């Protein structure tokens, strides 16, 4: 048995199913490249058959990310598997991940199929996938609630057909650690050809035990792959948190005895990137990546840490990518200093043109803000990448003018482009942000409902840039938009337009759990 634990990240597929977490193609590529920098073993880039947008994103990631295995989900049918294979063709290394439900409840109520029909479909799906690759993963959906004898029969058959990874999914987060770990162990013991496949765990956090269940699957069950997401992103209560799995296995190597290929210094940058793109704020007390994860308020604890860090710290903040919030650049800093700091932060831009554009944004910010922090630099790059993506978007922010006097309703004028043609919307509102949104809607008329408006300061002080998240809903579809600017109202306009672009761009995608 291998002593390496494979990290399978599904932020771009299962994580995106969290309401409001839909991402553009460009955003998915940025996250995939960060996962590659982190040396994630397998990146599940999407569900190719769900939409043309997902297919394109998987295909582009497969062509650009070369150091990780790229994977696509596919239902257990020839059409889905063919679509996945077509999207993955440019990859250096790829995997097809096919699945079908095996629990009595799912077979009867969702699939309306008999166990024998499910057995045959699973077997034939893996056989068809073998035409494209030897790297095939099979998941019995809702496996933790499946009949043991039937589950063993199905898994033995798909391994015989060529499945090289068997993923035991706790789809609804029903498992508890001891039982789930023993489930994986029992399957490995009872299936005669189990040694021909790596067993994997995929847990959801409905009862708050996704990480505990996954670790039990590894320690008790002998699983050697964990499926997880950055920040535990996912629908309902989320998925297994990548950062918690990685640091638990690394910190307690004395207990787990497993090696990892992950560059842990890229964990916090990945967490911040996913949070910024999705608009899902990381709770301050979140393990590893929360703002308070390495903070000590107790006087006794502070004294101990000052004398010897290992008195109260079992991990070092710098080992997971935390850096001091220090002033690094100012308006007199040159292009080379800016480029060097980007490299130190692990931020890469694809071309000199992008670097020049980001540096121009930096100089503009430095004229308005005396102190530039690392977080500002990351926001600048994010803003530039978003602007490049918006070149092909339906709506593009241009400018904002506003007027507000005590006792009068604020007025706003927003200039933005619609497919390249500039329009100007003017309106009043209960406040400057309300007026700005109303001004945009005078030209757009989206009919979307505003579900969430939140503001977060990127750094400290009155000159801090504001990061605004806007969540919109229309026809049952929920999207997030994020905008940054030292002017909160301008950041709000950018966020609103970003959300509108997401509403406009992608038709509803198939959800594999409901397909």
Swiss-Prot record:
EC number from the UniProt entry: 2.3.3.13
Record-linked InterPro entries: 2-IPM_HCS-like (IPR050073), 2-isopropylmalate_synth_dimer (IPR013709), AIPM/Hcit_synth_CS (IPR002034), Aldolase_TIM (IPR013785), LeuA/HCS_post-cat (IPR054691), LeuA_allosteric_dom_sf (IPR036230), LeuA_bact_synth (IPR005671), PYR_CT (IPR000891)
Coiled-coil parts of chain: none
Cellular component aspect of the GO annotation: cytosol
CDD domains given in the database record: DRE_TIM_IPMS
Claim: ATP-binding is one of the keywords in the record: no
Disulfide bonds: none
PROSITE patterns, per database record: AIPM_HOMOCIT_SYNTH_1 (PS00815), AIPM_HOMOCIT_SYNTH_2 (PS00816), PYR_CT (PS50991)
Pathway entry: Amino-acid biosynthesis; L-leucine biosynthesis; L-leucine from 3-methyl-2-oxobutanoate: step 1/4
Single GO MF annotation: acetyl-CoA C-acetyltransferase activity
Catalytic activity: 3-methyl-2-oxobutanoate + acetyl-CoA + H2O = (2S)-2-isopropylmalate + CoA + H(+)
Cofactor(s) listed in the protein's UniProt record: Mn(2+)
Principal place of residence: cytoplasm
Localisation: Cytoplasm
Keyword Amino-acid biosynthesis attributed: yes
Region span, Regulatory domain: 396-515
Family statement: Belongs to the alpha-IPM synthase/homocitrate synthase family. LeuA type 1 subfamily.
Matches recorded under PANTHER family: 2-ISOPROPYLMALATE SYNTHASE 1, CHLOROPLASTIC-RELATED, HOMOCITRATE SYNTHASE-RELATED
Job of this protein: Catalyzes the condensation of the acetyl group of acetyl-CoA with 3-methyl-2-oxobutanoate (2-ketoisovalerate) to form 3-carboxy-3-hydroxy-4-methylpentanoate (2-isopropylmalate).
The protein, known as: 2-isopropylmalate synthase
Gene expressing this chain: leuA
